[in-house]
């Protein structure tokens, strides 16, 4: 295991492995390795080019070559075989052996100066979500005095892709400010989003009392303590901070909608609970910074509620209102409209062919793979009761669950995926049901898990 780690840090380079001296704490600090890199590998580079290489070596992940601060030097580095390219030849990074050696030459102050230059660069260009995280990495690494506020800005909307970066970056910030209640609060929020119970519990213990309410609610859901969750919700409805009340009400309503299975009869208790949670939301007191995201979340909940109550006209109005919130909401509007199409299919208002065509178009328009798979999974669930063969054909178009993706949204998708698979694989039915139950519990969907446990026991 130690040899593998050393090999990884030296980029797997055979000569570097031979030159490695075990008396050094880090492989790249070996004098022989450093001399080899400087005197042989980088012998054709001048000081300015080495300075540019240092900047590229400080990037945390492969980046788009044209967006690099040192894009003018990429060609030179490539000719010298100093770079490692992604399979599509778009993203680039410095070969790991060279990167680690260049970093080892820099003291902490020099590294901070480079991070500062890079943060200024990334701040001044148009960025993707991933590049937002690169910017945040450099801002934290340069010791930016506003790092708490900068992290908070990124927490307004936590996507699955962002949560991976944020979890790491917040821990990095905590190494610099371990006593920061704000940072522990942010870490707990991301852990709740990723359904990471042990991490959530750890950080809750380091948060100021008045900010614990919403996180204790999330913890109760994730641990399957629905009665405790309801008690926590009721106790906090008179919270002095209306923003906290709004967040808890939106979260409770959304979870109640999601905590069910597709072939379950809609009961009045579910509808009454969702209406109760929605009634606690005061839109006039939504924080300006999160108002847009909160309005979208509320509209999505109301859209789901309208379909549960078979009010297709209301559902259409809600999907149109989401579309009016800007370009970023267009993909979400397609998701809502696809649910309306499926509703019409189940009520014999449109044909299967029309529905599949609409779903195919909606899926192809999505850039988020979780969204696209969720759209098709909705169709699979609708087809199972009356055309199991066609449902299976659509199911085969879905990606299999991936272990490295962590978010409550994705876990709910995976739980539904396993439930659907139980219908198509009779010999694996019990295994699929057990997996669906387990993932439903991970996502905090206790009611759905209990229903499936009853089914499992009846089969056994």
Question: Which residues does each PLM region occupy?
Answer:
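The conserved phosphate-sensing helix
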Residues: 9-21
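C-terminal non-catalytic interaction modules
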Residues: 400-460
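Residue at a conserved register position within TPR or TPR-like alpha-solenoid repeats
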Residues: 139, 191, 220-223, 260, ...
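Alpha-helical repeat scaffolds
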Residues: 115, 149-152, 164-174, 196-207, ...
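A eukaryote-biased feature capturing mid-to-C-terminal, repeat/solenoid-rich segments of large proteins
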Residues: 30-32, 41-50, 99-133, 144-167
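C-terminal boundary/linker of central alpha/beta nucleotide-binding cores
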Residues: 35-105, 112-120
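"A position-specific structural signal for the A-helix of alpha-solenoid helical repeats
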Residues: 134, 186-189, 214-218, 222, ...
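Conserved small helical "lid"/interfacial subdomain of P-loop NTPases
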Residues: 1-2
């Amino acid at each position: 295991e130690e040899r593998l780690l050393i090999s990884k840090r030296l980029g797997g380079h055979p000569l570097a492995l031979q030159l490695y001296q075990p008396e050094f704490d880090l492989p790249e600090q070996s004098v022989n390795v450093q001399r080899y890199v400087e005197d042989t590998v980088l012998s054709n580079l001048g000081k300015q080019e080495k300075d540019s290489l240092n900047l590229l070596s400080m990037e945390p992940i492969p980046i788009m070559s044209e967006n690099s601060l040192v894009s003018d030097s990429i060609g030179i580095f490539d000719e010298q075989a100093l770079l490692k390219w992604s399979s599509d030849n778009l993203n680039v990074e410095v070969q790991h052996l060279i990167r680690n050696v260049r970093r080892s030459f820099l003291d902490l102050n020099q590294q901070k100066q480079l991070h500062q230059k890079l943060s200024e660069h990334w701040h001044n260009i148009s960025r993707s979500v991933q590049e937002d995280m690169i910017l945040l990495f450099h801002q934290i690494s340069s010791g930016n005095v506003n790092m708490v506020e900068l992290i908070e800005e990124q927490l307004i909307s936590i996507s699955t892709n962002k949560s991976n970066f944020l979890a790491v970056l917040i821990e990095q910030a905590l190494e610099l400010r371990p006593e920061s209640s704000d940072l522990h609060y942010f870490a707990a929020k991301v852990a709740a989003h990723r359904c990471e119970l042990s991490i959530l519990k750890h950080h809750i213990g380091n948060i100021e009392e008045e900010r614990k309410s919403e996180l204790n609610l999330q913890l109760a859901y994730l641990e399957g303590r629905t009665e405790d969750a309801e008690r926590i919700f009721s106790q906090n409805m008179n919270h002095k901070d209306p923003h906290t009340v709004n967040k808890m009400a939106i979260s409770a309503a959304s979870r109640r909608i999601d905590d069910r299975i597709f072939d379950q009869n809609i009961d009045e208790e579910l509808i009454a609970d969702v209406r109760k949670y929605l009634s606690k939301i005061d839109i006039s007191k939504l924080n300006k910074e999160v108002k847009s995201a909160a309005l979208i979340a509320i509209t999505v909940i109301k859209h789901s509620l309208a379909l549960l109550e078979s009010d297709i006209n209301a559902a259409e109005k809600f999907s149109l209102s989401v579309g009016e919130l800007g370009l970023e909401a267009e993909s979400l509007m397609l998701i809502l409209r696809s649910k309306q199409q499926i509703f019409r299919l189940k009520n014999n208002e449109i044909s299967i062919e029309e529905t599949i065509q609409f779903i195919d178009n909606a899926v192809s328009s999505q850039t988020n793979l979780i969204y696209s798979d969720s759209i098709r999974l909705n169709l699979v669930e609708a087809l199972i009761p009356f055309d199991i063969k066609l449902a299976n054909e659509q199911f085969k178009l879905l990606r299999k669950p991936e272990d490295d993706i962590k978010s409550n949204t994705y876990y709910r998708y995976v739980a539904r995926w396993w439930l659907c698979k139980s219908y198509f694989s009779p010999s694996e039915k019990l295994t699929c049901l057990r997996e669906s139950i387990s993932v439903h519990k991970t996502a905090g969907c206790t009611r759905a898990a209990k229903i499936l446990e009853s089914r499992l026991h009846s089969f056994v």
